Amino acid sequence: MASSSSAAALWTAAPHPHGSCIRIHAIFHQRHQRRGRRPVVVASSVRPLQAASLAVATAPVAVASRRTAAEEAVYEVVLRQAALVEEATHRRGAGAPRWAEEDAVDWGLLLGDAYHRCGEVCAEYAKTFYLGTQLMTPERRKAVWAIYVWCRRTDELVDGPNSSYITPKALDRWEKRLEDLFEGRPYDMYDAALSDTVSKFPVDIQPFKDMIEGMRLDLWKSRYRSFDELYLYCYYVAGTVGLMTVPVMGIAPDSKASTESVYNAALALGIANQLTNILRDVGEDSRRGRIYLPLDELAEAGLTEEDIFRGKVTDKWRKFMKGQILRARLFFDEAEKGVAHLDSASRWPVLASLWLYRQILDAIEANDYNNFTKRAYVNKAKKLLSLPVAYARAAVAS
C-alpha cells in the first residue's frame, strides 16, 4: 500500500557480516552477556487472526459486545504495550549498565554511525517528520529514526522493486532477524540502531511482528469483505507504528490520561493514516488488481468491483466516498485527543503529520472524489502554512 519509492540502498547488506558489522556482533554479544537482556515478550503462538476469535470468545460479555473481533485482538496488544511502559516507569532510576571502557568507545563510534545512517534515510523519505524530530531529545530522535527505517525496510519487502521475489519464507526469515535484534544480535548497521533502541525504551516486539503479518497478508489477500477485516489490516501495516513509537516519544509527566488511552490515540492515528492512503490510492491499487475497500459497504452503496476497475466517478461513488472520508476523519479526531498527552518535545511532529495527512482527505474532495485518475496531495504552500500552526497548537496543548 505504501509508495514504492526506491529504497534499494537499505538492502545493500552483504550476505555475511564483514568489517564494522563483525565488530557490532561482537560488542552486542558482550553487552548481552554482561547486562542480561529484557526477555522478548510474545503474546502467544496463536496467529493474530486466530487470536482475534479467541479474545472475543474468552472476553467478558460486556466487552465482547462493544468490540469486534479485530478490535479485541488489537486491544490486547495495546494493553501489553501500556503495561510495559508502566513497568519501565517504576523501574526508572535503577542505574545505567556498565561495560568495559574499550568496548564502550568502539560501541559508541559504531552506533553513532548506525543512527546517523537511519537519520539520513528519514530525512530523504519523510522530510516533514524528520524536521519535527529535531525538536526531540537526541536519544528519542535517534530511536524514532531507527524505528522508521525498520518499518520502511519491512514495507519495501512487499512494495519495493524486489517485491515480486518475496515469499512467505522470506518474511519468516525477516521475523527471525527481528527476534535476533531484540535479543541483541543485529545483522547490520540499521538493525544495530534498532537493537540499541529497544534496549533503552520499553518497546514490545509484538507490534513489529504484527507489521510483518500485514506484509504476509499483502502477499495473498487483495480483497476485504468488511471493515472489520480492513481494520485489522490497517492495524498491522500502520496502527502498529503508533504502538512502536509512543514508548520513545514519551507521555507528558503531568498527563492525567491513562497510558492505555494514549496508546489508543496513537493506534487511531495509524488507522486514520492508512485509511487515507487507501482512499487516495484507489485507482493505483485497482490497476494492481487490489481493492482495499470493504466489499459489503460497496454493495450497500450499489457499487461493484467492476465499478472500481472501470474508474468512473458517479453520484453513487461520491456518496460512498463521503462516508469513507467521514470515517477516516473520525479516527483523526480520536488521534488528536491524545497528542496533548505526549511529551512536549514530541507533540509537534505528531500533530504536523496528523494535520498534513488529514488534508489529503480535503484534496480528494477538491478533486470531486476522483481518486481513480487524480492523486490527491497537499501542495508545498499548504504544508508550509500548516507547520507553524501545528507548532503553536502543540506548544499550548495541555
From Swiss-Prot:
Tissue expression pattern: Expressed in leaves and endosperm. Expressed in developing leaves.
Q: How does it sit in the membrane?
A: Peripheral membrane protein
Q: What does its record list under induction?
A: Induced by salt stress and abscisic acid (ABA) in roots.
Going by the record, the broad EC class of this enzyme is transferase
Q: What's the Enzyme Commission number for this chain?
A: 2.5.1.32
Extract one GO BP annotation from the record.
Answer: carotenoid biosynthetic process
Name of the molecule in the record = Phytoene synthase 2, chloroplastic
